[in-house]
Structures are given as structure tokens and as C-alpha cells.
């Protein structure tokens, strides 16, 4: 029964899509990883994606609840965001999504 109840609990994904000034992606990535390291309660993982050959990227951060993200926006997190803000060409587009499907790799594929 607990597996069914876990299925009913939805995770949330915070998605930011943006572009950094030329040559600033690596610096932004380092600050992103620093910001992520401050997260605790409700944090379920994160990805930073980069369009090859560009300074465009997508950050995806997974949370148990939307409120968990708000709870994790502490002073250290805010200071890191301030350091990062000047690296963007323009402010990123941000949205919350409800995770509607999650498909882990099969055991056979994971062993290959």
C-alpha cells in the first residue's frame, strides 16, 4: 500500500531557462553547484543542461513540495544568486512543473 501512496505524491520541478554572457557558463555552473549545495529539506536532485557550443542552459531542480524550495532560500543561497545575476544576458525564464512521470532505467540496461 505504501508504494501506491508514494505514487500519489507528486514531486515538483523548478525549471530555469537562460543564456549567460559569452564565456560565463562555467562560472555560472560553479555558482549553481554552490547554491544547490545549500539545499536540505525536500530537495530531490538537480540537473544543469547546456546547449552544445553555446552559453545557453536549462537548470532543473526537483523538490518534494513547492514550499520546500521557498524554505531553502536562505541567506547563503541569496548571496550566491546575487553573484550569479550579472552573468545572465537577461533574467532567465522560470516555471514550476509537477512531475507527472518518472521512468528509471531497467536493471538490465543499467548493467550494460
Where are these regions (language model features)?
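Short S/T/G/P-rich N-terminal loop/turn motif that feeds into the first structured element of a domain
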Residues: 1-57, 62-75, 79, 86-112
Amino acid at each position: 500500500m505504501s508504494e501506491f501512496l508514494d505514487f500519489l505524491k507528486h514531486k515538483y520541478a523548478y525549471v530555469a531557462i537562460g543564456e549567460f554572457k559569452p564565456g560565463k557558463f562555467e562560472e555560472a555552473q560553479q555558482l549553481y553547484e554552490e547554491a544547490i549545495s545549500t539545499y536540505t529539506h525536500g530537495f530531490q536532485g538537480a540537473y544543469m543542461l547546456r546547449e552544445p557550443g553555446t552559453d545557453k542552459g536549462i537548470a532543473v531542480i526537483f523538490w518534494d513540495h513547492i514550499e520546500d524550495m521557498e524554505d531553502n532560500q536562505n541567506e547563503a543561497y541569496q548571496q550566491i544568486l546575487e553573484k550569479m545575476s550579472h552573468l545572465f544576458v537577461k533574467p532567465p525564464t522560470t516555471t514550476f512543473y509537477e512531475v507527472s512521470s518518472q521512468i528509471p532505467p531497467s536493471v538490465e540496461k543499467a548493467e550494460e
